[in-house]
Amino acid sequence: MGTHDGYESAGELLRALAAPLRIAIVTELGGGARCVHELVEAVRAPQPLVSQHLRVLRGAGVVRGARRGREIEYSLTDEHIAHIVADAVSHAREPRRPARVAESPALSGDPASINPG
């Protein structure tokens, strides 16, 4: 197993989630399966736009659709995705802290500060 196993898949997942509306959709689906009209109401976006974003999420394997009568009900393929999104949203809502100065001489970027011996 290489050290980069899973990085490509993680990158694809994060790219699929890289839109505020898709984050909102995944957040809603974290609470359970929803039909398109329910998602439209919840995220307050036009139906064609919600459907377009659902296609992206379905193509990335984030959501799946199942027919429920005349409608398609969408759900997350993996509950971990809801946690990833919830953590990202929570982190984004935290107050920004100033960047920390490197604590280690090796991290400062100054080659003279690194003791080779």
What are these regions (language model features)?
Residues 13, 60, 70-72, 86-90:
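Short, structured secondary-structure boundary patches
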Residues 41, 52, 58-59:
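Alpha-helical residues within the helix-turn-helix
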Residues 1-5, 9, 79-117:
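Amphipathic alpha-helical dimerization/coiled-coil segments
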